[in-house]
Structure formats: C-alpha cells, structure tokens
C-alpha cells in the first residue's frame, strides 16, 4: 500500500482481513493519518448521512456517473457499520455530517491504527516511494528515497492529492484523469 492516509488504511485493513498474508503501508511522511487529525477542525467529519447512493453522487463536482459503482458497493451506511464494528460510534449532526462520538479526530486515527494492528498490517513511515516497476512475471519492485527495496505481488496507490501516486501510475502505463477537489457540499 503506497500511502498512509485513510484510503490506504481502509484498503490495507480490508486486504488483511480478507486473507492477504503480508500487508505493508509505505508512508512518505514521518506519521500516518496526519490529515485525518486536522480534518473537520480536529473533529473529523467521517461521512454524511445520505443513504441513497444516487442522491449522494449528485453532490460531487465530477457528476454521478464515475461514482455510482463505488458508492453502490460501499455506501455511507457501510462506512458507519465498518467503524461501529471496529469500535468507533459515529453520530449525526443536524446538517447530516457524521463525527466520532468522542468529537475528536484522534478517535478515528486510533480506530484505524487499532484495526490495522489487529489485522496484522505493518506500517513504515518516512518511506517515500520513488520507483515502482512491474516485472514481466507481474511482480512489483518498489524502492524509496532511502534506497530500501520491496517486492510485492500487488500494489495499491493511495497517495491522496499528492502527485507522486499519479506519477507512479503513469510510469506503469496508466492514463491519468486530471484530479479535481471533491468535497461534499
């Protein structure tokens, strides 16, 4: 997993819980989940109480078509249930925003870290991936800024808004769609 933000954590935990034997999160910065800590003014707006995926996709600037599938497979209710199953209760505010019951973002960080630890996910901070190559056999070779080398059968890029993930994907031959901000409104 390249990226130690919430998407990287959710993907790593899910992979480990579904039986992937060795899951490693490589995070470029000294600490994982840093943006979660500051989101929502330190409270972390986890999701929004919008139960119909078709309604939810209408709130995103790219429109509904690209998001219909993902939001139908893992909707707001699924997110709420996931956190509840992992020990974090979310509460709805009058405007539909959902925050941790503790009303502090650190509760979300602690929940994700606990779930990762329980699932056997390993975390390596300060590991900015510089090169990602795919061999003819389909295995990946990964190296970071310290020349540490990793091999993997699968790689998931979850670098958030940082351009490094797009560059790595492009280096592998993927076509990149220019990103746009996508906050719920």
Go through the PLM ranges and name each one.
Residues 85-111, 118:
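Mobile, glycine/GP-rich and aromatic-enriched active-site lid/loop segments adjacent to catalytic centers
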Residues 39-40, 86, 172:
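Short, structured coil segments at secondary-structure junctions
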Residues 16-41:
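Glycine-rich FAD pyrophosphate-binding loop
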Residues 1, 5-7, 31, 156, ...:
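Residue-level detector of alpha-helix initiation sites
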Residues 18, 106-185:
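Predominantly flavin-linked oxidoreductase catalytic cores and closely associated redox partners
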Residues 1-25:
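N-terminal Rossmann-like FAD-binding beta1-loop-alpha1 element of flavoenzymes
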Residues 4, 28, 181:
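Cofactor-binding loop segments of dinucleotide-utilizing enzymes, especially the Rossmann-like FAD-
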């Amino acid at each position: 997993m390249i990226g130690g933000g919430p998407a990287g954590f959710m993907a790593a935990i899910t992979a480990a819980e579904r039986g992937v034997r060795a899951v490693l999160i490589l995070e470029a910065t000294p600490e994982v989940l840093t943006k979660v800590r500051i989101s929502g003014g330190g409270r972390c707006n986890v999701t929004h109480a919008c139960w119909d995926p078709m309604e939810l996709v209408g709130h995103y600037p790219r429109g509904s078509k690209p998001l219909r599938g993902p939001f139908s497979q893992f909707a707001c209710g699924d997110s709420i249930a996931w956190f509840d199953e992992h020990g974090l209760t979310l509460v709805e505010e009058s405007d539909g925003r959902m925050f941790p019951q503790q009303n502090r973002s650190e509760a979300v960080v602690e929940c994700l870290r606990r779930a990762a630890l329980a699932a056997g996910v390993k975390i390596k901070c300060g590991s900015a991936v510089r090169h990602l190559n795919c061999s003819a056999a389909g295995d990946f070779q990964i190296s970071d800024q310290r020349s540490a080398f990793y091999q993997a059968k699968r790689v998931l890029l979850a670098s958030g808004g940082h351009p490094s993930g797009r560059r790595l994907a492009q280096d592998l031959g993927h076509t990149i769609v220019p990103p746009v901000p996508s906050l719920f409104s």
